[in-house]
Amino acid sequence: MQYLVDVHAHTIASTHAYSTIHDYISVAKEKGLKLFAVTDHGPDMADAPHFWHFVNMRVLPRLVDGIGILRGIEANIKNRDGEIDFFGDYLKELDIVLAGFHEPVFPPSDRQTHTQAMISTIESGNVDIITHPGNPAYPIDIDKVAEAAAKHNVALEINNSSFLASRKGSEGNCIAIARAVHDAGGLLVMGSDSHISFSLGGFEQAILVIREAEFPEERLLNRSPQALLSFLSERGHDSLDEYSVLLRS
């Protein structure tokens, strides 16, 4: 199956990434993707864009040459209380909100602390997707996190980049997460976590994890633009007429 949706991509606004939105649109067209999210790092990261970058995403077109563009963020989980570095009414202006642990903002601690912080983030209602929860630097109680995510309709990400250039040793955790989410009745999404446009829509290793865990296709948000957009609507984001053309994909 070809997966037409990518929820996790960084642009040159995060200065350790190397591509523009134009670059991503070009690659999306070449690869046949229909929808992707621009999710630069939240402002508490040292090289992240300013808060205003996210506020001003309203200027981004929803569609370019038939490619849908979601306005998003990969926010930073800041503490055990599940606070993130983007807040208030500004969150409502974004189409999609991802959040995860990043060492410069939340240094690795212990399993109990990581689990509490992740569950608090899930319970906050502010975050749609938890990124790279299988990172071995941040051990968690996988079953508890999967159950909380299912209860609160938050998706957990299987992050393809975790099997390539970063977060080495994630495979076992990610398989366990996929199985736990399966058992809890929750949702998964694959993210390329692209920091350069060529890797947009690259899910090769994540697909192997999904298959190993025998995760059901109908609970994988990448399966179609409609699946992701319906999920975001259920999460309280606005349904946008501009994306209606994508719902036939």
Curated annotation (Swiss-Prot):
GO terms for cellular component: cytosol. Transmembrane segments: none annotated. GO terms for biological process: bacterial-type flagellum-dependent swarming motility. One of its GO terms (molecular function) is zinc ion binding. Zn(2+) 1 binds at residues 8, 10, 74, 193. Binds 3 Zn(2+) ions per subunit. InterPro entries: Phosphatase_YcdX_put (IPR023710), PHP_dom (IPR004013), PHP_phosphatase (IPR050243), Pol/His_phosphatase_N (IPR003141), Pol/histidinol_Pase-like (IPR016195). Its cofactor is Zn(2+). Keywords: Hydrolase, Metal-binding, Zinc. SUPFAM superfamilies: PHP domain-like. The keyword rRNA-binding does not apply. This is Probable phosphatase Swoo_1706. It comes from Shewanella woodyi (strain ATCC 51908 / MS32).
